[in-house]
């Protein structure tokens, strides 16, 4: 089994947005993690992030977004990490130091806590977090 990963919501959203560039790579990446049983360690906020983004892309089709969240929640090798006080404090420091959005900093904090690579399509995460956590795209 390979090393666990933290997968940003951008990967899931891209995978389920077939008209977006790289969607096929994101889809294959998620499927390979599932197939190979590689632990996926993500903040629990990944679910509302995905639902919000997909529902918006689907002309406010919230039913599709909710079904998708259920499918993701049922990935057997997925661990949803709640935001506790320590993780929040670490995310505060990361957000302030690296000028990141709060959710991006939370993914970084989860990645640091569990010693995972952070896999993302988010340009700010890719550009700013390499000094504190391994950051990569699904095709690397």
Which role does the model predict for each range below?
Residues 7, 41-42, 82, 102, ...:
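Short beta-strand scaffold positions
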């Amino acid at each position: 089994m390979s090393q666990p990963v933290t997968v940003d919501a951008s990967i899931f959203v891209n995978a389920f947005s077939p008209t977006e560039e790289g969607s096929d790579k994101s889809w294959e990446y998620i499927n390979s993690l599932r197939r190979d049983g590689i632990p996926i360690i993500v903040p629990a906020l990944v679910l509302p992030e995905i639902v919000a983004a997909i529902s918006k892309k689907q002309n406010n089709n919230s039913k599709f977004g909710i079904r998708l969240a259920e499918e993701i929640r049922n990935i057997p090798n997925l661990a949803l990490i709640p935001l506790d006080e320590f993780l929040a404090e670490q995310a505060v420091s990361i957000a302030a130091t690296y000028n990141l959005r709060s959710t991006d900093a939370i993914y970084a904090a989860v990645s640091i806590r569990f010693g995972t690579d952070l896999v993302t399509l988010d340009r700010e995460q890719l550009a700013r977090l390499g000094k504190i956590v391994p950051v990569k795209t699904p095709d690397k």
